[in-house]
């Protein structure tokens, strides 16, 4: 029986490293993009040649980063052509690209739509210029609105906007105003995340040395509740702890993660999971490129998930979603353990 699965591709290039971001990204390396694209194509071909993926039914592709919207459409089309040699592209329901307002030109947006990308995720983060500056974002609130309108004109009918709360000096009123302004745009999907202090980031350093004071847990919780309330009142369904969507506009790719479905991944730092094993690539562009030059996969390490690991992950992921834990799927994953009998006891 085939399993619905996703494909993730990581583009590490950025114009600036945001102080709160712990995803793998690099600046001042855009000259490496042509070589990077060729390496992604090589990784795809190598991976499919070395792995039996016949039981996986790929229906989503997610282009993340970094800043994928810095990549010219014809380069991304090369990647799609490589994938089409191994998968049935007619089965793909959703192709998402992450984009930063102010960095995705009208020409690029039109080009993305023409090559089959049907969903775009804008990293707004805030519509307050002061808070955007704190977050090291290069765009302004006005550029967010312009980028959204340009995407609509380019033909995107499925748009997500990422927002952040729990930002120092962000009041409940500012948060409410920002959310209502975003909702006026009527995106199909809104993600809203609490700003977390990740080790190794500039934000972590500034919080540790006292330069930045984070909001307390009570205010963080109030912001979360206000966000949920505003979204609900505006017709957005909260289907996961941080994600809100209009009817039938959930992010299909992210549902694969939360359902513990298989997904494969390409690019530096990318993580994949085939239903039994999880693996992750080297978190270095130079190492990634050099290993593929030797016709080897750039996998740093892997682990076999035990039944207990799968059980715990399905419970934790399920509790984040509105549908809760899928007992039938839990039974399938755990094999010998009959969850229904355990619950009755």
Predicted feature residues:
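Cys/His-rich Zn2+-binding cysteine-cluster or related metal-binding knuckle/ribbon modules and their
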Residues: 54-55
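Short active-site neighborhood of thiol/selenol oxidoreductases, capturing the structured segment around
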Residues: 8-10
